[in-house]
Amino acid sequence: DQSFGWFFSNWGPAFARDGVDGWANDPAGIIVDTDGVGTVEHPYGSSSFLNAFLGGNNVLNQQYTGERYEWKPYKSVENFFRSGSVSNTSVNIRGASDDGNLSYTVNYGNLDEEGFTPGNGLRRNNLSVGGRAVLSNKFTVQGSMNYSNTSFVSPPVAASRGNGTLGWSTFGNVFFTPRNVDLMGLPFTIPENGGSIYYRNGNDIINPNWSVANAQGGQTVNRVNATTSLTYDFNDNISLTYRYGLDWYNERNKDYSNKNGVNFNDAIFGYLRTWDNNVNIHNHYVSLNGSYDLSDDVGLAFNVGATSNRRTYERSGVSSTGQIVYGVIQHFNYENQTPLAFESAQNTLGVFGSADIDYKDYLFVTLQARNDWVSNLPSENNSMFYPSASVSFLPTSMDENFKSENLSYLKVRAGYGTSASFPGGYPTVNTVGQSTNVNGGLNGGIITNSVSNFQANPDLKPELLGELEFGVDARVWKNRIGINASYYERNTKDLIVFKPLPTSSGYTS
């Protein structure tokens, strides 16, 4: 269809004057010759277009009524995006005592990144310190701490077909813009109300420049990872280690849009969502470690110990809709507020042991076992024992006659290992959602409860993952070629999956 209209997206007459598809042959006759240049009515010059939004007496109507608009390709995409930049700075300080018993390190890093999309940027500051001290009383102390602060902002981004039917996407609206529309030369704001305005007759696509100026998603993350350990050496063969680890994570989120946009309720009425996600992980670890030569041919290394892990997650925030005064991004400036809240916790206790046995440096056997208990499963199903074993044999280390110029190294290995996977949250109990309406009228507030569409499984068990592997490693042709071949089979018992359910059951999964 070569007929022009401000309803179109990516078609229309050619930009050349002549030819079958030239604008001089526009079937509708809308493109006219103005002093040798093809022109059309300015997209904001139609009184019917502007009257639909503001009534006849408005600034844009007065400015563009009767104005002509040159029919030519504009560099809208090229001019919308900008050149990105990245600045990265790092400083490292380290030192140690003359005897090596005391050492430390300090690192600082800064990243400042400006994206190629307007309104997009990332900044990160990172500080880490660490140290180690070997004391005269057989104790060794070491620790490390890393703190990072990351801030990120971006205009709306989502899956889109350009006209916004799938989601509010700045990219989609930019690439959907026809070549003959001067994106960067057209006003994007209606002066009377700050709303979005764009070229289409129905003003049914958000102007990308309005999105950049009026809507944003942002996130600031503060995170601390810290580890400290204390080791006591009873003698040269056996030691005891305690280690504590902390992972603290705080995520502050803010999404908003001013009102008077188009196409989406969030843009039309305005919204503000702010919420925090907080994660705390505390981990305690203690182990007894040993290493002995049982004979001239047999060596043994072992460790036994226990772990304790506690993980908590908390979300809290407010979602507000219905902006009252344009430009004021505060929760008190919205008609409706909905609280956001969620909490979960999981404790995991474990005991473990392992032994490594070697015979004449050519036969190696490893045995491992662990048992874990978790707090968010019923007592009859909250424990899992999972052992592992592996063996490796090096013929080339056992007998030099196996070696040659064409085979310098050969290792044959086999192993069977198991591990456990525990579900998070509270999958064995049904949950109830609670919503409040503080504006309940004369009868006061209304509290509504709803049952989750997820059906809990009180008989849920942890997953047991098992893997059997056989392999060969070799180096041939004077060590020029390395060969690694493996066969493995992996199985999962009591696999946890989300199963769709018919809605007639009252649940969906």
Task: Give the residues covered by each predicted segment.
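Extracellular/periplasmic, surface-exposed regions of secreted and cell-surface proteins
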Residues: 124, 130-139, 144-149, 158, ...
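N-terminal, polar/charged subdomain of small-to-medium soluble alpha/beta proteins
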Residues: 263-264
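Low-complexity intrinsically disordered tracts that form flexible linkers/tails across taxa
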Residues: 152-178
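Intrinsically disordered, low-complexity coil segments
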Residues: 95-101, 158-167, 438-447
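Glycine-rich cofactor/substrate-binding loops
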Residues: 180, 187-189, 367
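Pocket-edge structural micro-motifs
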Residues: 95, 178, 185
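Residues embedded in well-ordered regular secondary structure
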Residues: 1-118, 156-159, 189-197, 207-217, ...
